């Protein structure tokens, strides 16, 4: 949706859902967030999506909210002041997207966690008895510009289509969106979380799916010439 049609008083939380139990937990945390006076929040679960990009595009089309948060069903947002924190960062119109963890410069592989300088913080709760504070570098100021962020949480203030024409599954959609933001002239940033983290992520421990490599090759074909890795 064009910027002039977006409603600055609304924030939408968009999630692809295949587990009602997980989404109920995710939604519980979202409904506990502090919503600034004059703003409203809407929650858009997308079920039976053929891919993450297709689901997120469907959610994007359903909302005219200026601020949209695309998050996994197993992401729990614990920062009560999230909405105001996002508004503060998005006061700079050139910022297109905010993630909670990512890398300053993508390596040739296109895999963000292989980058030399990773920024941000996420609490990973993969098992009931195992909680890991994944704490990378912290921005020196309120945020750090990065090239890519992880898809567990991506907030936007400009509507850019997710590349469902290329990423027809569940991998590399997030890094692709970051590159699409940059192609449109917008920055992608990670906030300072030194005092406290924004999200808990509860993924199941599992190896990378076999189709990951195929999407990695597709990513490199589309964006490889735009990568300038740090050495």
Identify the meaning behind each predicted range:
Residues 2-5, 19-35:
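Short, well-formed alpha-helical segments that are part of the catalytic scaffolds
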Residues 10-22:
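A conserved hydrophobic helix/loop-capping motif in glycosyltransferases and polysaccharide synthases
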Residues 49-63:
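Glycine-rich, basic loop-to-helix element that forms the pyrophosphate-binding segment
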Residues 68:
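Short aromatic/hydrophobic "clamp" motif used to bind/position activated sugar donors
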Residues 72-76:
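The conserved acidic donor/metal-binding loop of glycosyltransferases
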Residues 80-119:
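Conserved donor NDP-sugar-binding/catalytic core segment of glycosyltransferases
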Residues 130-156:
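A recurrent flexible, glycine/aromatic-enriched loop bordering the glycosyltransferase active site
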Residues 165-231:
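C-terminal catalytic/acceptor-binding lobe
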């Amino acid at each position: 949706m064009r910027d002039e049609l977006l409603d600055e008083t609304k924030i939408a939380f968009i999630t692809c859902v295949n587990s009602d139990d997980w989404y109920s937990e995710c939604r519980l945390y979202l409904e506990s967030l502090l919503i600034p006076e004059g703003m409203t929040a809407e929650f858009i679960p997308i079920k039976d999506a053929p891919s993450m990009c297709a689901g997120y595009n469907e959610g994007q089309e359903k909302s005219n909210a200026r601020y949209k948060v695309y998050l996994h069903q197993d992401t729990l947002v614990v920062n009560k002041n999230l909405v105001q924190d996002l508004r503060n960062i998005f006061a700079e119109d050139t910022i297109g997207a905010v993630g909670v963890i990512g890398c300053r410069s993508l390596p040739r592989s296109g895999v963000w966690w292989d980058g030399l300088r990773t920024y941000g913080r996420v609490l990973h709760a993969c098992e009931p008895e195992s909680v890991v504070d994944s704490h990378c570098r912290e921005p020196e100021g309120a945020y750090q510009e990065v090239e890519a962020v992880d898809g567990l949480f991506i907030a936007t203030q400009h509507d850019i289509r997710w590349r469902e024409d290329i990423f027809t599954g569940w991998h590399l959609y997030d890094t692709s969106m970051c590159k699409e933001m940059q192609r449109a002239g917008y920055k992608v940033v990670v906030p300072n979380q030194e005092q406290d983290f924004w999200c808990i992520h509860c993924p199941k421990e599992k190896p990378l799916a076999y189709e990951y490599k195929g999407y990695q090759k597709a990513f490199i074909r589309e964006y490889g010439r735009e990568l300038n890795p740090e050495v």
